[in-house]
Structure formats: structure tokens, C-alpha cells
Amino acid sequence: MPIITLPNGDQKSFDQPVSVMQVAQSIGPGLAKNTVAGRVNDRLVDACDLITEDATLQIITPKDPEGVEIIRHSCAHLVGHAVKQLFPDVQMVIGPVIEEGFYYDIFSPKPFTLDDMAAIEARMKQLIDQDYDVVKKMTPREQVIQEFTTRGETYKLRLIDDMPEETQMGLYYHQEYVDMCRGPHVPNTKFLKNFKLTKISGAYWRGDAKNEQLQRIYGTAWSDKKELAAYIKRIEEAEKRDHRKIGKALDLFHMQEEAPGMVFWHANGWTIYQALEQYMRKVQQDNGYQEVRTPQIVDFTLWEKSGHAANYAENMFTTHSESRNYAVKPMNCPCHVQVFNQGLKSYRDLPVRLAEFGSCHRNEPSGSLHGIMRVRGFTQDDGHIFCTKEQIGKEVADFIQLTLDVYKDFGFEDVQMKLSTRPEKRVGDDRLWDLAEKSLADALDAAGLEWELQPGEGAFYGPKIEFSLKDCLGRVWQCGTIQCDFNLPIRLDASFVTEDNERDQPVMLHRAILGSFERFIGILIEHYAGFMPPWLAPVQACVMNITDSQAEACQQVVAKLKENGLRAISDLRNEKIGFKIRERTLERIPYLLVLGDREVEEGTVNVRTRSGKNLGTMSIDAFVDLVKSAVAERGRYIVE
């Protein structure tokens, strides 16, 4: 006789075991109609699952975040149903939920095409219209093996082998199609109407490039049409803002097969890169950092001593010379410890703050490379602070404020911060972890902003704070970090002399604000759709003549703008002024200056912005002041 306690405290008694759906029906037909699953004693279960004893129950509907995830997971199974009807010879692998969607990996003798994807989506809609029930059957292990053996689903059998402890498994039947899953899933296909397949890509079995290649079909699903439409609109906008397309259109950079994951910066893109570097150099100098430069290639023994060889070897590029093995550095930290170790350090010398625009290389899988967002060769605004345990709090607090100020300069006000604390496997004693975690939490509280705790997500060598930016499309990008490290200073023999004339290891704080320059520039390109604020624009002003008689005056204006530190060019082509304005507008140049006979005679310029706003006629000095004012405001200034 189970007694069910609902979220509002109401209780319902039943004479016998009762399913989640039956409880929903006892509350009302409207709720039952919208029941996707249930949360029984804080565990998600299927709507058909029985409750046999007293329990708490929350009915999950499409309005709940869990309901949306269940809809997405069930849509992945629906992909399997449609694919097996259209392509019976393929083998289904795995179909998990991901952020804002789902995918299904499939082994197919031939790659799927966009036409295939359209056919799969159409078949999915036909199946949804059949309004069939999804049937769950808990099945003994041997029967599950027999089921998938009969169906020739070898990948499912391999997955079963990975779960030797499971004596029975959930099989979900979509009519003649069956899939294996822990669930829960929707009770009926009526919940799956608001979906769309989005793309096809390649993947590897178990994510290992040494294994066979699979076809991955991506999709998204939502609880209603409006949410789906809004998502599709965001995706379309994101495609328009794709940094690879804009990078090509604005002549910023290119990638090519001969150097996978390495960026060929063009003059325009390199100007943006240099603006970032010069800005960050001044920020670091103003905040007590010493800029250093360390080698690109270092003997492999250092990486063995630091622990990177044991844990990171697959991602390291290596080389050999004169009987010695070397690695191209994937990160700067061990090298910065070598700089710190030169000369005896006293507690009076701490903190020591080292910074480097460190060029690093990591052997990322070719399938994961993505424009300049995911590369093999990159530069970090890397820094390491060597301090005492007592100095952790102040150093972290100062870094948080510095990071938030930098993000504001780039136009990012919405910053998410997460504190990751001790994992089960870790180094260092608990008192040190207590101190470090409290120091980081107190520093976050002092910043006066909300932050999220991630228990157990810290690195084995210390807790960390991660900083993530939200862009104009609502996408979240993890960029900055500060991490306490109790391990590397010990491994690499870093020490200082204490006030008691004893030797002690410093705490090492790994920190970065932008992260990878390449990735951060990619984020900026997509955030601004290439319409960079004046301080980052490769060309800040273009001076154009109406007829040949103003050509010399245009060149003189450009020369004066350059003398004042502006990035300016001229356009003296024998084209109509309207054509030149349109073309330079497409290049996202913030300011377009036009000279006719009147402007030449008066020594003025007619100024308009790339958005078409006419700022009128002004002196050259006034225009210089206008641009310098805009540059001083950095990302806070919007060119209208």
C-alpha cells in the first residue's frame, strides 16, 4: 500500500503498486496527458515504472529541464528507428543527449549525405504521426545478447561486454525497432514533434582515431514549436557569424592542409592579434607581472619529472636530436618553474608573478580541429604566480577583479564563475586544501558576483576557478582560469627561504585570462560578427575621394591619421563614391571619410559610420579625437 508524497506535500495512498502514469491520472487527465517520466525518491524513472513502497514523486513534463532531456534522448532512438527502416544494413552504436540536442553514431558502409539526412528526418516525422507507444521491457542479459545477435548489431554487443555487472537491461521498443538504454524515455512519440536534424559528421568508435570511422547524425529537440524556432534562428545566426566565413571575407587568416591546426595570419588578422598582445602586455605590466620567454623545445626528461610525460604524452609533439629526446612544449608551467628556480628566493621576494605569451603546440585529433577555435599551435596569455599559502587569498582576489575588468574591455559583461574543489584522488594534505578552497571561495564572495560550486571537479593538484563568457547569442565560452598547484613546485624542486630560515615550497597559481589568443579572437569575431570595436578593427578609417582632384588631399589625410596612431587607408579608385562606400562597409571598417572639393577647400572630412550613420563634416583633429575617444572606451564603445 504505497503512500506517494507529491512536491506540494499532498499525499496519495494506493492499495497496490502503482505506476508513475497512474499517479498522474489520479491527479488529473491534463497532467497525465503531459507526463513524460517521473522522479521517484530523487531518481528519474519511466512513466510505466511501478512504485511499490512509500516514496516521493515529481511528475516530469516537457516544461521541466529533465523532460526536455528525455525528449532529446528519445529522439535519438527515433533516429535509429528511421535509419534502420531506410538503411537496414547499417549498425547502430550509441545515441546520447548533448547540450541543446542529441546525436547518434552509426556504422554505415557508405557515408550519409545531406539528402540522406533529409530522408531520415522525413521518415522520423512519419513515424511520429503514427502516434505509437514506446514500450519498455526489462530483459535478462542473455536475452538482450540474443536479441542483438539476431539483429546483427555487433556494436550493441560490444557495449554489453562493457557492462559485465548488469544482469538485466532496459530494452525500448519503437514498433519493430529496439534499442538498449538505462532510460527513461517518453511513453509515446507525440512528445517528439518539435525536432530537427542539424548536421552529419564523422566520428570514431570509442573516440579513438585508430578505430573504425562512424557516421554521426546530430539533431535538436524542444518542448514546443517556439523554442525550436528560436533555436533554429540562433543556429542560423551563428552560421552567419562563423569565424571561418568572416575570417575569409575580411582577409584575417586561413588554414590549409599542409599545416593542420596551425593558423596562417594575414595582415588584417595579425593586426587584431597584435592589439590583443599589446593590451595584455600593458595589463600585466601594470599588475606586477614580469614578462619572460621560455624555449619551444625542451628535453623530454623535464616533462617526465613534471609528470606531463606520464599523463599527456599522446598530446605532445616530440623530436630527436643527438641521442636526446625532446618535446615541443604543450604548456609553459614547467619552464616557468625553471625561471623561478634561478637564484635563491626569500619569503620577502614573494609573490613572484611571471607572464609569457607562450607559444604552445598540442597534438589534438584532426577530427576535433575547428578553424582557429580548436588548433594545434596557439599562444596563451599564460601566467604563474609563486606565493606563500597565506598569500593565496589576496592573489586570487586581485586576479578575479583584473579578469573581470579585462572582459569588460572586450565587451563581455556576463561572466560565469565556477569553483571546482578537491577530487577523491589528489595530492597535498587536507589542511592545505581547506585553506586553498576557502581562499578561493572568499575571493569569489568578495567580488560580489554569483558563482557556482563544482564539488570534486578540481585538478588532482589543487582547486580552481573557471571564468566563462556569454556571447551575444547566449553561448558560453570558458576562457579564463586560476588554479592552485601544490604538486608541481615539489616535483620540480621549487623552494623559498621562510621567515624562520627554513626551506618551503611555494604554492603555484596557474592563471590565464584570454586563454588561447586564437580561440579568443574567434570568439570576438563571432560575438561582433566581424564588426570589431574601433580599438580592435584592423583598419579604423578609410578615406575616399569623389573625383581624382581630391586624391592628393586624401593621401595627406591618411598620413595625418597615421601620424596620430590611427590605422587608416585610402580608396582612390575611379569608382562611384556609393560603390566604394558599400564595398568598405562590407569590410566592416568603422569610419568612412569622404572628401569632395568643399572638404578639400575647408580642410575637413565628411564622416559616416559603417552602419550608415552620417556624423557630418568635421576637422581632421576632431575626427582623430573622436576615434581616440572610441578606442579609449574599448569594447564599451559601439559604432552606430
Curated annotation (Swiss-Prot):
Q: Which organism is it from?
A: Acinetobacter baylyi (strain ATCC 33305 / BD413 / ADP1)
Lineage runs: Bacteria, Pseudomonadati, Pseudomonadota, Gammaproteobacteria, Moraxellales
Its chief place of residence is: cytoplasm
Report the subcellular localization. Cytoplasm
Q: Where does Zn(2+) bind?
A: 333, 384, 510
Q: Does the keyword Ribosomal protein apply?
A: no
Q: Which reaction does it catalyse?
A: tRNA(Thr) + L-threonine + ATP = L-threonyl-tRNA(Thr) + AMP + diphosphate + H(+)
What does the cofactor field's note say? Answer: Binds 1 zinc ion per subunit.
| This protein's name | Threonine--tRNA ligase
Subunit text: Homodimer.
Q: Which residues form the TGS domain?
A: 1-61
Q: Which gene encodes it?
A: thrS
Q: Which NCBIfam families match?
A: thrS
